[in-house]
């Protein structure tokens, strides 16, 4: 077997539809596009969201909201992900080193999701009430 002898299984590939190749093909002359009109022309058709000149939905509805720039540099960390970090003291840099959060992250908050079994010290991270209770129950502590 060589690369130049490989071919798809019989019946696995369908031949493309050949249009505009005579009356007998069933798709000659207008090639299945009908007569006249915008969609029959080369490059015809209307853009996405166009409603024939009527004020389109995306312009009829009001604008709202924005994208918080702080949300882009903030991460949520689960309790179970703290197990991936080596060492007893966990801060933002150790989370980045363990690939728990991305390098562009500047703020992190620890959430109560999963379990923590070892005692760790969190430094400079925000913590939810539930996560704080779980960390302290495991013998850890939180430093601001």
Swiss-Prot record:
Coiled coil: none
Example of a GO biological process term: translation
Family matches, as Pfam families: Ribosomal_L27A (PF00828)
InterPro entries named among the record's database cross-references: Ribosomal_uL15, Ribosomal_uL15/eL18, Ribosomal_uL15/eL18_sf, Ribosomal_uL15_bac-type, Ribosomal_uL15_CS
Keywords: Ribonucleoprotein, Ribosomal protein, RNA-binding, rRNA-binding
GO cellular component: cytosolic large ribosomal subunit
Positions of region (Disordered): 1-52
Keyword Ribonucleoprotein recorded: yes
Biased composition (Gly residues): 21-31
Family statement drawn from the similarity comment of this UniProt entry: Belongs to the universal ribosomal protein uL15 family.
Quaternary organization: Part of the 50S ribosomal subunit.
Name by which UniProt lists this protein: Large ribosomal subunit protein uL15
Gene: rplO
